[in-house]
Swiss-Prot record:
UniProt: Mg(2+) 2 binding residues: 1019
Localisation per UniProt entry: Cell membrane
Originating gene: lysX
DNA-binding region: 661-739
Keywords on record: Aminoacyl-tRNA synthetase, Antibiotic resistance, ATP-binding, Cell membrane, DNA-binding, Ligase, Lipid metabolism, Magnesium, Membrane, Metal-binding, Multifunctional enzyme, Nucleotide-binding, Transferase, Transmembrane, Transmembrane helix
Gene Ontology MF terms in the entry: ATP binding; DNA binding; lysine-tRNA ligase activity; magnesium ion binding; phosphatidylglycerol lysyltransferase activity; tRNA binding
Taxonomic source organism: Mycolicibacterium vanbaalenii (strain DSM 7251 / JCM 13017 / BCRC 16820 / KCTC 9966 / NRRL B-24157 / PYR-1) (Mycobacterium vanbaalenii)
Reactions catalysed: tRNA(Lys) + L-lysine + ATP = L-lysyl-tRNA(Lys) + AMP + diphosphate; L-lysyl-tRNA(Lys) + a 1,2-diacyl-sn-glycero-3-phospho-(1'-sn-glycerol) = a 1,2-diacyl-sn-glycero-3-phospho-1'-(3'-O-L-lysyl)-sn-glycerol + tRNA(Lys)
Family as reported in the entry's similarity comment: In the N-terminal section; belongs to the LPG synthetase family.
Protein name: Lysylphosphatidylglycerol biosynthesis bifunctional protein LysX
Cofactor(s) needed by this chain: Mg(2+)
Function as written in the Swiss-Prot or TrEMBL entry: Catalyzes the production of L-lysyl-tRNA(Lys)transfer and the transfer of a lysyl group from L-lysyl-tRNA(Lys) to membrane-bound phosphatidylglycerol (PG), which produces lysylphosphatidylglycerol (LPG), one of the components of the bacterial membrane with a positive net charge. LPG synthesis contributes to the resistance to cationic antimicrobial peptides (CAMPs) and likely protects M.tuberculosis against the CAMPs produced by competiting microorganisms (bacteriocins).
Residue numbers binding Mg(2+) 1: 1012, 1019
């Protein structure tokens, strides 16, 4: 059981059945009374038992609509455990028991009358006993209402009904004596036929008798309506409540497209105790119907839901929710309710909206018709309209309300022209200077709108609504809108599934029923009016407590949504009618809420709610934030403008004794010895000791430093270089200034961040405290700089080519897919810059390179990252042999720049890194030769596929049956050679079939002029003698494109632009590709994630 459901639960009792039983008994009498008032047959059938019950048990007149209505209300109240119903029933039972006692005391001549009185008395005493024992089961209260107004209405209605009934009796008296006619009318209309008919001389016609009871029932109904309406109005939103809701919407309104409808003034509201969330609701037929998601901070939704459920229990209401989002429905489910998908909300994203395409043909044609008819669209905020124009808007909305062409929606604000709604958007269609249609949309956060009202003139041209929606999407960028909600269409999935080909009989029947009821209610209209815009459908849910209450919740929803309008119902209150502020007293006490319902001071409310957040923060953070506030109150700017220091820490340490310096950095450690304080200060260049002595400080004391500065703070200090009393070279501080307050504590000053995942996620903290992390950043920068210097020294040009590409090519890898809204075009993040660099080669750039980012949607491990730095370089009139020396030189120079020597750092068995010399030439082997060494059997380019498969089987290496010989050799190479390689080795002459962009070997058939550089099981780079034959290039890429079309996600697509460029002839060229991240990894001896400043991390 959830905490909320535990809060709602009451102790079980042996008398829990009493309210339901009492309700059922009274309800049966009410039903029989109503049927007897309508049907003479029923009246005749139950005459004998009715008369006995009426005489000894319970008032049960032969015909009385008024009494049937009273009993129906009482039965419903008893079943809902209303305390006032308990009092009424107990009082009636005591009065009835007294009547029987009085009868027995008088004595009766007929024995069966005495028996009846005894039985009736026993029943009354038993009923009173059970009701008294079950008193605590009737806990539900009744909302406050205008009792005096209701009582006056009852008296006046009864008086009018009695007079009219008296008049009817004078006109149609039947056998009723003249002297009894007024009293008879009074008895039937106002006294619920409490006096027996035998007490009067004669009786009127049965039809007149029924009319008299109906007059009483109408009087009671009018009174009930007045009372219920006063209850709703009296408990509806106050100005302060609406102001609080608007404040929550300003902070959290972006979460819910229907959130603004919570400001409707015919709803009531209940807040979480903190005031950070609220639920608006309305009570219909005993159901407390919450409208959509709670408003406010999602973290406070459980508290708001708990307060709402407690309210439902206190008043005996059945809880229900209408139109909750998936997040809201989940929150209600966690509170113990059940969820049922009600429909789908139609969301338009203007950046994706296009009138082109076959799916939008109907909308496009409608828009064209409206434009041809001369319709134009103007869009304004409500606050931009003068008072006279807004009055005209309201008048048009009322005039067009009942037209056959009206397209209303179920979720509506129900008011126009209120100053508090100035941010609402008005879209008008104008024809010949006359407004012919309009839309009103309410805010959805800061960049969205939700449809509230849709009206059109009967004379508006066809397609006007489509024109307004389309123009709103087209002009959305100018008015700052990125989301448009058309509200939700109920039972959308039923309409869609029932219309599909092959739909089952149940789905078709369900759709037929919905279409049938759409004649009266806008069910299909809502669906079709949204569907044609091709929106995103977002599900909305209804929530309920018990499956048995689903019908009641459904009826309440139908009434609340306006599909069923009750007599004399008042909807969409314009003014604030509530008299009881529901907002928490702490929130009201801030003075930020406005009694007119306008939004509170946003920054003030945000600051107030932020104060409530403080207990959620760790204690050290709260202490530091309190210190920050104290400093700001003293006028200290904890984040001042820059004042460049005169020295770095390294320069200060190298300065002469007594030199004046000003440095800035982060405080890492601090030791206070009273009048003298020592602190460690670090900047990027190094770390030094600060000595703060009260005798040396120009202003303030060490105590001021201790009160103000925490570990991790950024400070600026001035002073002279010298030695401490212990002889340590230090900065003797004469003045200091805080330049950045650190609000979160640093990790352990000796160990730092020990968790690798934490080091990745908080790299900034790792850099602040870990010198190794800083050294890796420096080494990576040195590697990149050395690579550039080496290539530029050889007259290579550095260029930049597109990262967003329409065709993924240049390597066999799975790409990342993205989309450009401006052109409605799918694009790829490049997997390699090769094809664009070769275009430059065709254009005459003979030596070119690019050092940039590439992206491959593949695995993540110690040597792979989806986003990586890639070097590609091309040299005309060269081949892959040239790049053997060129690649080795690049890596050796990079190692020299990072480590000070041509070495790789490799871990020993104990994990300690040691240098491994990589100077001089590196080993070169052929692929087939290396595989032959590993297998112990000779293979070559001419080895047949069957033999290669047999060798794989012997070595336990898996392969796919559709692979050719080249692919099998590559698999043998990767398992037996690449993974086992230690010192840097070049493996050359790969099979042609696995090298689609490489020229065939000049003398050896079946292999291509390509090499891979491998070191310690990691592929560092590859080089080709590039394939320059455009005809052969096209054939190979067509083979690749067939693989891609067949479902291979790594196969390259056919790039016609590249092939056309190649047909202009590219000179013989050697190309190099090198993974820079892997080079840095081997040079530093760390994993890729450690060498990258910000590697990709999985979501928390």
């Amino acid at each position: 059981m959830t905490p909320t459901s535990l809060a709602r639960a009451r102790p079980t009792s042996s008398h829990r059945w009493v309210p339901a039983a009492a309700g059922w008994i009274v309800g049966v009498i009410a039903t029989l009374s109503l049927l007897a008032s309508v049907s003479p047959l029923v009246r005749s059938l139950i005459r004998v038992p009715r008369e006995w019950v009426d005489d000894y048990i319970f008032n049960f007149p032969d015909t009385s609509f008024a009494w049937a209505f009273v009993l129906a209300l009482l039965a419903a109240a008893l079943a809902a455990r209303k305390r006032i119903a308990w009092w009424i029933l107990v009082g009636y039972m005591i009065a009835a028991a007294g009547w029987n006692i009085a009868g027995l005391a008088e004595g009766r001549e007929r024995w069966f009358a005495e028996v009846g009185e005894v039985i009736g008395l026993a029943f009354h005493l038993a009923a009173i006993a059970f009701l008294l024992l079950a008193r605590k089961e009737f806990w539900a209260r009744v909302r406050r209402g205008a009792l005096l107004k209701a009582a006056a209405t009852l008296v006046a209605s009864m008086a009018v009904g009695t007079l009219i009934g008296w008049g009817l009796l004078e006109l149609f008296p039947g056998s009723l004596a003249r002297s009894d006619r007024f009293l008879y009318a009074l008895n039937r209309v106002s006294a619920f036929a409490g006096a027996d008919a035998a007490s009067f001389s004669g009786h009127p016609h049965v039809f007149v008798n029924a009319l008299l009871g109906l007059f009483g029932a109408v009087a009671l109904m009018v009174t009930a309506i007045v009372l219920f309406q006063s209850q709703r109005a009296d408990n509806a939103l106050t100005g302060e409540d609406e102001s609080a809701i608007r404040g929550l919407l300003e902070l959290y309104g972006k979460n819910d497209s229907l959130g603004y409808f919570a400001t409707r003034r015919d709803k009531a509201v209940v807040f979480a105790p903190s005031g950070r969330a609220a639920i608006t609701y309305r009570v219909e037929v005993g159901v407390c119907l919450a409208s959509g998601d709670p408003v406010g901070d999602p973290r406070s939704w459980p508290q708001a839901i708990d307060a709402w459920l407690k309210l439902c229990q206190a008043y005996g209401w059945a809880p229900g929710v209408m139109g909750a989002s998936a997040a809201g429905a989940q929150a209600f489910r966690e509170a113990g309710l059940n969820a049922l998908q009600l429909g789908d909300e139609a969301i338009l994203h203007p950046e994706d909206f296009r009138l082109s395409g076959p799916d939008m043909r109907a909308v496009r044609q409608a828009v064209t018709r409206a434009r041809r008819a001369g319709a134009t669209v103007r869009i304004r905020r409500h606050r931009e309209l003068p008072a006279d124009e807004m009055a005209a808007v309201i008048e048009r909305a009322d005039a067009w309300r009942d037209t056959d062409d009206e397209r209303g929606f179920s979720m509506a604000l129900g008011r126009l022209g209120d100053p508090a709604d100035g941010d609402c958007l008005l879209v008008e269609a104008v024809q010949a200077d006359q407004v012919v249609a309009m839309l009103s949309l309410v805010p959805w956060g800061g960049n969205g709108v939700s449809l509230d009202l849709m009206r059109r003139s009967p004379q508006s041209p066809n397609g006007t609504i489509e024109l307004m929606v389309s123009e709103l999407c087209m002009q959305s960028e100018d008015i700052g809108i990125t989301r448009i909600s058309l509200n939700f269409a109920m039972f959308r999935s039923a309409f869609e599934q029932g219309a599909q080909l092959g739909a089952g009989p149940v789905a078709r029947l369900w759709r037929w029923l919905l279409v049938f009821f759409s004649r009266w209610w806008q069910l299909e209209t809502l669906y079709r009016s949204n569907m044609k815009y091709q929106p995103e459908w977002v599900p909305r849910y209804a929530c309920y407590d018990d499956a048995r209450l689903v019908p009641r919740v459904g009826v309440a929803s139908v009434i609340a949504e306006g599909f069923l309008v009750l007599p004399f119902s008042r909807r969409h209150e314009q003014p604030h009618t509530g008299h009881h502020i529901a907002a928490p007293g702490t929130l009201v006490a801030t003075g930020l809420l406005h009694s007119d319902g306008t939004a509170p001071d946003g920054m003030g409310l945000q600051a107030d709610l932020a104060d409530d957040d403080q207990p959620r923060l760790p204690e050290q953070v709260r202490v530091r934030m309190a210190k920050l506030k104290a400093l700001q109150a003293q006028g200290v700017d904890a984040y001042p403008v820059a004042n460049p220091p005169s020295h770095t820490v390294a320069q200060a340490l190298a300065a002469e004794d007594g030199a004046d310096v000003a440095v800035a950095g982060r405080v890492l450690r601090s030791r206070d010895y009273g009048g003298v304080l020592f602190a460690q200060l670090r900047d990027w260049s190094g770390e030094t000791q600060l000595v703060l002595d009260n005798s040396l400080l120009a202003d303030g004391s060490t105590a001021d430093f201790t009160r103000t500065i925490d570990l991790g703070d950024l400070i600026e200090v001035t002073g002279t270089m010298g030695r401490s009393r212990s002889g340590k070279w230090s900065l003797l501080v004469s003045g200091w200034r805080l330049i950045g307050k650190c609000l979160r504590p640093l990790p352990d000053k000796w160990k730092g961040l020990t968790d690798q995942e934490a080091r990745v996620r908080a790299r900034y903290v790792d850099l602040a405290v870990n010198t190794d992390a800083r050294e890796l950043i420096r080494a990576r920068s040195a590697v990149l700089h050395a690579i550039r210097e080496t290539l530029v020294a050889k007259d290579f040009l550095e260029v930049e080519t597109p990262i967003l590409q329409q065709i993924h090519g240049g390597a066999n890898a799975r790409p990342f897919l993205t989309h450009i809204n401006a052109y409605d075009l799918d694009l790829y993040l490049r997997i390699a810059p090769e094809l664009y660099l070769k275009r430059l080669c065709v254009g005459g750039v003979e030596r070119v390179f690019e050092l940039g980012r590439a992206f491959r949607n593949e695995g993540v491990d110690f040597s792979h990252n989806p986003e990586f730095t890639l070097l590609e370089a091309y040299q005309a009139h060269a081949d892959y042999h040239v790049w053997i020396d060129g690649c080795r030189e690049l890596i050796q120079n990079a190692a020299q720049a990072a480590n000070g020597a041509q070495v790789f750092m490799r871990p020993r068995a104990d994990g300690v890194l040691e240098p491994v010399d990589i100077s001089g030439p590196w080993t070169v082997k052929t692929v087939h030769g290396a595989v032959s060494e590993a297998l112990g059997e000779q293979i070559g380019p001419d080895t047949d596929l069957a033999t290669l498969r047999l060798l794989c089987d012997r070595a336990g290496i898996p392969y796919l049956t559709h692979w050719d010989a080249g692919a099998v050799v590559l698999e043998l190479y990767e398992h037996l050679v690449e993974d086992q390689t230690r010192e840097p080795t070049f493996y050359k002459d790969f099979p042609t079939s696995v090298s689609p962009l490489t020229r065939p070997h000049r003398s050896i058939p079946g292999v291509a002029e390509r090499w891979d550089l491998v070191a310690w099981g990691v592929e560092l780079g590859t080089a080709y003698s590039e394939l320059t034959d455009p005809v052969e290039q096209r054939r190979r890429l067509q083979e690749q494109s067939l693989l891609a079309a067949g479902g291979d996600p790594e196969a390259m697509e056919l790039d016609e632009d590249f092939l056309q460029a190649m047909e202009y002839a590219m000179p013989p060229t050697g190309g190099l590709g090198m993974g820079v991240d892997r080079v840095v990894m081997l040079i530093t001896g760390r994993s890729i994630r450690e060498t990258l400043p910000f590697p990709l991390a999985k979501p928390r």
